[in-house]
Each structure stands twice: as structure tokens, then as C-alpha cells.
């Protein structure tokens, strides 16, 4: 990856590999810094296990331009990818982290709980819950207490429910989720 640069870390790594199977690797320790996309991310703590193509455990980033704490299980290598995790994002500044060229001097915070399956947005089955979403920029400030998105499939029809303090919506039928914003 051209965007990946120097990495400084102190990790305990224990692994095993059996022929014709994905390796099992336990990781615990600190990535002091990693250069990615012309930015040096600092203080990344890992405590988890890479198994069968997925990661189960905790990842924490404590960077001057935001903190992220993830705890749970993500497996994108299984036949049907699975996501079951919690995340806390605090004062993240995506422009300063070189994640986007847009939104200078903007930061956001939120708590997220996700439990869903699917390899794309159109295959999603499950639930995402966002709490305490806070967005701050020089021009705007926004706060939302809670938003819940639930996607299911019944009788070969998609069902999507969105619930928040300012909107409750439900869509059912034969559609693809990615086409909804343009509708």
C-alpha cells in the first residue's frame, strides 16, 4: 500500500498456522506510531485475536486529533461477513487525520453499537445504533441523542426501519438499500 509508511510498535504476537487454514494470531501491545496517508497516527493499543480471517478484541487509538475505542468482532473473510462491535469516537478531526480534504476545523464524537451481517449495504441484515452524535464545525453545531437503523429481509422483501428523535421511517419492498438516497 503506497499510503502506508513507517510503523513503530511493541507487540506480543503468538500465532499458529495449519496447512489449508487461515492462521490464528493473538496480538497484544502498543503501536506507538504508524504513518498512513501523510499522517502519523499515535498510540494505538491492540488486544485481540485474528482468527478465521476476522478480528475479535479491542483496538484503541489515542491520538491528538481524536480517539477511537473499538471492542468486538469483525469478520469480512467469512462467506457472509459479520460485524458485532461497539465503538466510541471522541473529538475525531477527519481533515487533520488526512482522511478527507473536506471539513477543515471540524470534529465529531459518537457512540456506536453494531450487530449485522452482509458483504455490502444491499445485503445488510441487522442493527446499528448511534448514540450521542455530536458534530462541530466553525459554522455549525449539531447534537443527536439516538438513531437506530434496523434492516431485515422477510418473504424475499427488504425491510428498513430508521428511528431517531426527529424521524421515524419504514420502507418495505423489493429495493436495494443503496438506491434509497436518490429516491
Region spans (language model):
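Interface amphipathic segments
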Residues: 1-113, 117-183
Amino acid at each position: 500500500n503506497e499510503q502506508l509508511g513507517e510503523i513503530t510498535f511493541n507487540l506480543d504476537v503468538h500465532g499458529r498456522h495449519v496447512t489449508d487454514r487461515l492462521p490464528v494470531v493473538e496480538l497484544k501491545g502498543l503501536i506507538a506510531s504508524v504513518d498512513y496517508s501523510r499522517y502519523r497516527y499515535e498510540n494505538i493499543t491492540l488486544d485481540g485475536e485474528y482468527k478465521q480471517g476476522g478480528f475479535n478484541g479491542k483496538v484503541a487509538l489515542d491520538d491528538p486529533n481524536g480517539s477511537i475505542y473499538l471492542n468486538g468482532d469483525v469478520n469480512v473473510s467469512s462467506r457472509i461477513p459479520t460485524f458485532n462491535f461497539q465503538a466510541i469516537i471522541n473529538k475525531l478531526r477527519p481533515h487533520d487525520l488526512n482522511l478527507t480534504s473536506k471539513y477543515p476545523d471540524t470534529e465529531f464524537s459518537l457512540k456506536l453499537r453494531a450487530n449485522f451481517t452482509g458483504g455490502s449495504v444491499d445485503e445488510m441484515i441487522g442493527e446499528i445504533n448511534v448514540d450521542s452524535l455530536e458534530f462541530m464545525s466553525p459554522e455549525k453545531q449539531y447534537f443527536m441523542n439516538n438513531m437506530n437503523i434496523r434492516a431485515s429481509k422477510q418473504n424475499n422483501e427488504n425491510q428498513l426501519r430508521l428511528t431517531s428523535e426527529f424521524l421515524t421511517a419504514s420502507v418495505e419492498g423489493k429495493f436495494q438499500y443503496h438506491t434509497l438516497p436518490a429516491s
